[in-house]
Amino acid sequence: MGAVWTVRLLCLFLLLLNTRQSAALPHNTDQCAEGSDACHIDAICQNTPTSYKCTCKTGFKGDGKHCEDIDECDVEYNGGCVHECNNIPGNYRCTCLDGFHLAHDGHNCLDVDECVFNNGGCQHVCVNTMGSYECRCKQGFFLSDNQHTCIHRSVEGLSCMNKEHGCGHICKESPKGGVACECRPGFELAKNQRGCILTCNHGNGGCQHICEDTEQGPICRCHVRYMLHADGRTCVERDEMAPTAPDHNATSLAEVDKRVKRRLLMETCAVNNGGCDSTCKDTSTGVRCSCPVGFTLQPDGKSCKDIDECELHNGGCDHYCRNTIGSFECSCRKGFKLLTDERSCQDIDECFFERTCDHTCVNSPGSFQCVCNKGYTLYGLAHCGDINECSFNNGGCEHTCENTMGSFGCHCRAGYKLHWNKKDCIEAEDSPLVPPPARPTLNCNKQGGGELCYLTCQSQVHISSGAEDSYTVTCGMPLPCHTGGQWNGSYCPGSGIKTIATFKSGQGKCNLKRSHENLAHSFKTALSDKRATENVQFSFVSLHCASSSRQQRSRHGRKAGEEEGSFITAQFELDVNLEEVTAEGCDLTCVRRRSEKRLRKTIRTLRKSINREQFHLHFAGSEYELAKKLVRPADTPDHCGTGQILLDKKCVKCSVGTYYDGEQGRCFLCPPGTYQDEEGQVSCDVCPGPEGRGIPETAGARNISECAGQCRPGQFSHDGFVPCLPCPQGTYQPEVGRTSCFTCGGSLTTKYDGSVSFQNCETKVQCSPGHYYNTSTHRCIRCPVGTYQMEFGQNYCIACPGNTTTDFDGSTNIMQCKNRHCGGELGEFTGYIESPNYPGNYPANIECTWTITPPPKRRILVVVPEIYLPIEDECGDYLVMRKSSLPNSVTTYETCQTYERPIAFTSRSKKLWIQFRSNEGNSGKGFQVPYVTYDEDYQELIEDIVRDGRLYASENHQEILKDKKLMRALFDVLAHPQNFFNYTAQESREMFPKSFIRFLRSKVLRFLRP
């Protein structure tokens, strides 16, 4: 690992590990380590051969035994802040007045263009001004008292409606007649009682920096580091390198006389640097000035002017280019990071972290999206909660609805059974019997001196791909209930046998592969062969195949030389045939023993078949086998799981409406008469419905509702299939394939036949979002807490997903459903705290507390990448970090505002007690704050780094503190310096920009050579 790439990653940690520890000298009792020193809490204790030394930390002053905070706001021209300077323990922070936002340098304040957002709330015209804005009206209108909306003028009468009223801002009619003028806040009424004079209280008087009120109006001044622009309001940076403006009467250098030339020959670089701004060199003809890289020499031959590199080809930057004095800086759009060449931008893979999304994370250029599994819905931008389908429209169930995790089920009352659509209930006596679905069947016979077995699945097949070289196949349904030997259409545990067995499959890896052999003939032969050894029907079968590699086996204690292979874990459910029970011969217990014996024999036969890799799956009209040693093309970089294809070097599941063909390695549309509503499947399910009606089918059906021949929404029939009738007036049906329609209730009717929603019912009042229509009282009722409604005119509210709830009643969308759990993981070395529902808005009236207790001789470093707390609440929402819960204990950090700029700081106490509270007012995104504990020997170095403004001055440095992947690497090495060697040279080159490495290297060298 050479020294070059070592420094490129993070030289400080390697140097700290090798130098600090090896250079330590033997000494007497370490009073600093024992805690017996008398150093102040804001001082650093350094052990000496005979005693110890106390030194106040950066940002504090004193003798080390007594330290007090330095108020940077009282020195150096308000701390360099152009508006307000807020002192905090050991540091300070600049803030801006209303109407301004903090510039990237953290000191200057720039105007906010309020008109960009929603036209500033103005009805007609929005005009931005320095520090504020104003609304104006079109011809024929005047501004109302709220200063945003416009009112049409009347041309008659002396009133405020007349455009001749003369008021500069607000016009009000007096009780005695006539008009009286008023001014907006921040303005004073002029002596003529009509006009309005601006003051510093409104938009800082239009001044960018400093405003002073005078009788004639505000006068603008600038901070000492800036100068006033010709407009009298704007402040620009002083160009200290620019020469003083020449006298207009002065002659040019070419016109000077010989005396001046002789004087030039007498100039020397030893006196006043020869008048050069930068580099001076003595020559035979006088001094010669030159400029450093990034500057160009001006015509006077002395002055240097900054080159704006961004003017030419955007400075070579992929995204943004920002010119700086003597240089420039490239930066990237949100969602991208700057590479080490400090020019190129690369997408940040937010999905790198498992906790980015609860279920599935889909990365995209500059962004990402969280996707939830079927039966779950997204809330809080990243979280997934179970959908309570029964909470709206009873889940579409005709009788009762039962919610389950990720799904739901409809149930029927006594005397009824479920229709094939699993929602309607039909009478059990008068309706034709629904045949039970075909069961999984195992057929085995002897071929070629061994057992050849087929598992046949005619329906209820489900395939899911796991990790590489693994899959799960389920076939059939749980054991059905029987009544008098007839299928009754429902399911229950029943009287059956359930067993689990594990099989090893030679050297083949798990991969559902369509067979190249003509297995159809062999399959039919196996069914009719008199030598068949097994023919067993199961109720339910689950097969999970997982490949085993040599490395994995040796890690688990098996022999390293054992060959690779696959292991299949099979779960069988075998129904006990009650017809075999006889009064005199064999009771139920006897029949169960016989069934168990048959099952054991079947498993032995199946084991032989699988060991010889002669086990095949037959479903959806195709045959599949366990693939043997896969021969892969040399140019295929990765192996995708079953149901996935390689697309742009990424494994992508086959979409809904398609299935995966293992033989061709492609996704195909579901054939007509079938559908598939899940991704990554290797077959399609057969559409329900009566046969022989000649109904045209379409390919690629994505769910059962797209199967042809079903009654459309607003229709019904006795079996849910054509021919269909429209729902009569007073009823509606939002789904396909139904046998009945829902009634509006409350004696309500609909405007026409064939209504598809309750919204078509003629209610007495239309309910707005956040309400539902009560058909008993014919009133709109606010949705209770924990529910929401997005649409107009509905008769239900939707329950919030999972364990979320709403802050108040009357919620109108799912984003108002929030998890109230205080997030975070508190580890001894690394961890994080997180506001509830992050990255969604946190709930109202919440209180969270965390306590970070590091191991002995370790200190805490905290990084706040960004925090969103609405200041409009007057600090009703706040985050505080201090030594303990006592209000007067030592405080490390406290805020009740939004800061998008990151900040890093060390704890002022050994332990941190953290509290977050919110009130019932506005809400925000909140925060996710990571921390690390480090060896206290590095306290001085860490504080020197985090207190240096250069760490935050560069946008690229700010993005590093926001990049979770980079911060995890930094924290990993800070917590465990030996982990530095876990990072390869390639990783080190791709992690940090050179400017960040240079910044850290200077700190390390100064720390090692004080």
Curated annotation (Swiss-Prot):
Keyword Repeat on entry: yes
Intrachain disulfide bonds: 32-45, 39-54, 56-67, 73-85, 81-94, 96-109, 115-126, 122-135, 310-321, 317-330, 332-345, 351-361, 357-370, 372-384, 390-401, 397-410, 412-425, 822-848, 875-896
InterPro entries: cEGF (IPR026823), CUB_dom (IPR000859), EGF-like_Ca-bd_dom (IPR001881), EGF-like_dom (IPR000742), EGF-type_Asp/Asn_hydroxyl_site (IPR000152), EGF_Ca-bd_CS (IPR018097), EGF_dom (IPR024731), Growth_fac_rcpt_cys_sf (IPR009030)
The CUB domain, residue ranges: 822-934
Compartment(s) of residence: Secreted; Cell surface
A Pfam entry, by short name: Ephrin_rec_like
Changes after translation: N-glycosylated.
Highest taxon, organism lineage: Eukaryota
Region (Interaction with the cholesterol-anchor of SHH): 860-869
Name under which the protein is recorded: Signal peptide, CUB and EGF-like domain-containing protein 2
Organism encoding this protein: Danio rerio (Zebrafish)
